[in-house]
Amino acid sequence: MFNMENSAAKEKTAARQQLFDLEQDMHDLTKAHEINTNVQSKVQKVTASLREGASKESFEKQHTLLAGYVALQKVLGRINRKMV
């Protein structure tokens, strides 16, 4: 009625087509694996440097960086679950 059916269908298709760059990269399995391993290696490096100990300013910056990488891992996991 009043052409509402067509507009709803167009909105659904438009929402499917709007993907972030990261989501587009995650559709390619080789890039997805590369991104996951890269993030995992960076998390391990930051964790190792935190264990070594450093000044308070450096510790806080590294802790913030580690929190960002962990958040990125969560986002990547959610993207992978959404794609399946």
Curated annotation (Swiss-Prot):
Pfam families: DUF5398 (PF17376)
InterPro entries: DUF5398
Organism superkingdom: Bacteria
Homology family: Belongs to the chlamydial CPn_0711/CT_665/TC_0036 family.
Identification of the protein by name: Uncharacterized protein TC_0036
Species, as recorded: Chlamydia muridarum (strain MoPn / Nigg)
